[in-house]
Design a protein with these regions (language model features):
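Extended, subdomain-level signal for the structured scaffold at the beginning of enzyme domains
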Residues: 1-139, 152-172
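Conserved, well-structured core segments that form or line functional sites
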Residues: 143
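Short, thiol/selenol-centered motifs that function as redox-active sites or metal-ligating centers
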Residues: 146-150
Length: 173
């Protein structure tokens, strides 16, 4: 099948979301439906998908998202999307965002940041994620951010680390 183009999907490298009082939500990651539903639709319509994250490590599925509740209560649909997810070799071995930048962002037609709590761990102030998001904005290419994915837009700020640091400290950035 001839490809219509390429879509870059940014996912988290993190496997634990820091909470108050030193607690950590260890099940944090991407939400199954927020990643697989749009990725399947894009692939079905002829787009090639590239997964990337800050470390190039396998992203974690948010444990709370693997339930039929997020698929209209349909257990068969949940299993179908789990199987689809398992077939995504690029998700198991994502590129590093820095390597994607080095290979050229102009080859991509759109960027997608699925939700789940993962983006809150590392995409919100990742400098490379910021470079990607600024590039897509400057080139007027589609940027889709789902549920918790919009937190990654903070990375596009020129002072992202400062803003995120202030937020974590409880300051009004």
């Amino acid at each position: 099948m001839e490809t219509k183009g390429k879509v870059l999907v940014l996912v988290s490298s993190g496997h634990g979301l820091p909470l108050q009082e030193g607690k950590v939500y260890s099940g944090a990651g991407y939400y199954l439906n927020e990643l697989t539903v749009p990725v399947r639709a894009l692939m079905k319509n002829g787009y090639e998908i590239t997964f990337a994250n800050p470390k190039g490590n396998t992203p974690q599925l948010d444990v709370n998202s693997a339930t039929a509740m997020f698929f209209g209560g349909d257990e068969a649909k949940l299993q179908d999307y789990r199987s689809f997810r398992d077939s995504l070799t690029g998700l198991k071995n994502p590129a590093r965002i820095s390597d994607v930048i080095a290979s050229g962002l102009d080859q991509y037609d759109a960027v997608l940041v699925p939700g789940g709590h993962g983006p809150m761990i590392d995409l919100l102030d990742d400098p490379d994620a910021g470079t990607v998001l600024r590039h897509f904005h400057k080139t007027s290419k589609p940027t889709a951010v789902l549920c918790h994915g919009p937190i990654s837009l903070l990375a596009a700020l020129p002072n992202a680390s400062e803003v995120v640091g202030a937020l974590k400290a409880g300051d009004a950035a």
